[in-house]
Amino acid sequence: MQREKFSSRLGFILISAGCAIGLGNVWRFPYIVGKYGGAAFVLIYLAFLLILGLPIMVMEFSVGRASKVSAALSFDRLEPKGTKWHWYKYGAMAGNYLLMMFYTTIAGWMVQYFIKMMTGEFEGKDTAAVAGVFSDMLAKPGTMTFFMIIVVVGCFAICGMGLQNGVEKITKVMMLLLLALMVILAARSVTLDGASEGLSFYLAPDFHKVVEYGLFDTIFAAMGQAFFTLSLGIGAIAIFGSYIDKSRSLTGEAVLVTLLDTFVALIAGLIIFPSCFAYGVDPGEGPSLIFITLPNVFNSMAGGRIWGALFFLFMIFAAASTVIAVFENILSFAIDLTGCSRKKAVIVNIVVVAVLSMPCVLGFNVWSGFMPFGKGSGVLDLEDFLVSNNLLPLGSLVYLLFCTSRYGWGWKNFMKEADTGEGLKFPKWAKFYVSYILPLIVLFIFVQGYISKFM
């Protein structure tokens, strides 16, 4: 069967960026930027993106393009005879399914909140009542299941239309609308009365905060965010390498994807901080920022119902772009491994992903007694921990060693693939760094993740 290809370079870059751009860009990045010293932190973060995230992304793209298949078969095709690199296919597949087991539920929340904003449900509510809307939503497994299934069916339906006609065409429109919405929301936020304080908190370099939190903590926060923001290690990015030709070198393409991801994260901060400071609200981070803090801010704002609806529309696009990208990977696993049609893979996986997403839905209500990491934790935290703290760093380590070790695909093969085509070349002098130092950094992130979680 002839492998499908992207119809344009723009489609490839926007879809790869859509996979990388996730909810963490909005609910985590701005918060840690403000906490660790604004622009001072951003500079450290950008340095780590360059030396940590970028090389691994180039390696994922290279493995995908050279093998022309998903992570379900890419190691089988490229590994030296008699080696066992292909065992990691199970880790990659598990990572994609695990990520969707909670992401579909959160994407469903975004759809619910968009409707709530549009219908004016928050108007006239005080802070406690707005928080009550969120806890009421979590207490209703039936409603959450309904919206989760809408996300699963809707995003798989787009994938079912094919790579060019479905995934590429629709994600391109979504990503361009996402970027336009962000610019409009940021322009509104920075022109609010009192927004300047939020801007200086976010962007003014504050080296005192770097000292206050400790240089090590600041560097580790920057390192972790740079590593996790690009969703590397589970083959979610590699799949898009398998859909492109060899006309462009892969380092240049990875730089563009990384820049887009960074642009979205930085602009998210321009939406959140000026508006929170303008209304005297502590931004915080995580789901409470999106579902409690910001609805309160929109409540206080002239035309807040419209701005709130636009914000949640942007969040739907951010979540859906990731879901569609990962669903495309999940479908390609099925197609590559079984040779089944795209349509059959879609039908089977709609059922599989919907069923696998149920523990996350039930973890907030029926199964709320299950607290894997102590009080306040739930099923979602366990699923997130398995992906973020385990499969992403360990998978990245596999890609690194596979592309640099003579027992794997090897440095020469990797460099030949990465540098084929016009554009920026992968630096030859980086061989020692990516072969010996970068694997140690990734291992450090893995170990440190356990230390900060359990100690």
Where are the language model's segments positioned?
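Inter-helical loop and helix-membrane interface segments of multi-pass membrane transporters/permeases
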Residues: 3-4, 32-36, 66-91, 104-164, ...
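A generic transmembrane alpha-helix motif of multi-pass inner-membrane proteins
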Residues: 378-401, 423-455
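Select transmembrane alpha-helical segments in multipass membrane proteins
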Residues: 5-16, 41-44, 83-97, 145-151, ...
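Membrane-interface "cap" regions at the ends of multi-pass membrane proteins
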Residues: 1-27, 56-61, 65-90, 245-249, ...
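Transmembrane helix-boundary motif of multi-pass solute transporters/channels
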Residues: 10-48, 235-241, 252-255, 259-260
